[in-house]
Amino acid sequence: MVLYFKLIDPEYICYMGIDKFENEDLIKYGWPEDVWFHVNDLSSAHVYLRLRKGETWNDIPANILEECCQLVKQNSIQGCKEASVDIVYTPWANLKKTAGMEAGQVLYHNEREVKYVRNVRKDSKIINRIEKTREKREVDLMHERDSRDKSERHEKRKEQEEKRRAEKKAYEEKQKMEDIKKYTSIMKTDNMKFNKYNPTDEDDFM
């Protein structure tokens, strides 16, 4: 079971698992467009923000970042009781699992690809609005990821085919122009030869 929430202005979707075991599937089948959020040094929900195509985690609007942090803090048993917490976030692709790690536990491939939001305090107004958008879904995470990858491969093939057609057209246009230049050059050469060996006799016109 996955919980989905709608963030606004601009609109984004974020989601989280209901327990640490489901978090394992979220880690396994996350998307390259996803950004992972967690309360630093405390147990909490794993919240994922899904970016739009072409965006990077550096493009997250400040208000959307705040809403993600509020959602993470609210869904931490200990964190929600603290006056303030630090939130850690990183691209999904930077999450690392190793043998023997507990369910829901993660490391990072690159510590430099990790950011923090310090001293996050509860904002009840934001929490109340987000909670109203809560939607619980039964999701086949593996199927969704496979569909996403299939669509991406289709788009890449389409782009490559369009590129090949454009390159072919450009090549044909270039060849056409070169053929025209060659033809023009040949005609000029032939005219020069004709004029050289066939001089006009003015008496012919008298």
From Swiss-Prot:
Family: Belongs to the CCDC25 family.
Extracellular topology ranges: 1-34
Membrane topology category: Single-pass membrane protein
UniProt keyword terms in alphabetical order: Coiled coil, Membrane, Transmembrane, Transmembrane helix
Location of region: Disordered: 138-181
PANTHER family in UniProt: COILED-COIL DOMAIN-CONTAINING PROTEIN 25 (PTHR13049:SF2), DUF814-RELATED (PTHR13049)
InterPro entries membership: Jlp2/Ccd25, NFACT_RNA-bd
Upper taxonomic lineage: Eukaryota, Amoebozoa, Evosea, Eumycetozoa, Dictyostelia
Tagged with keyword Nucleotide-binding: no
Compartments reported by the entry: Membrane
Coiled coil: 144-182
Name listed for the protein in its UniProt record: Coiled-coil domain-containing protein 25 homolog
A GO cellular-component term linked to this record: membrane
Organism: Dictyostelium discoideum
Principal place of residence: membrane
Record's keyword annotation contains Coiled coil: yes
Regions that span the bilayer: 35-51
Segments on the Cytoplasmic side according to the record's topology features: 52-206
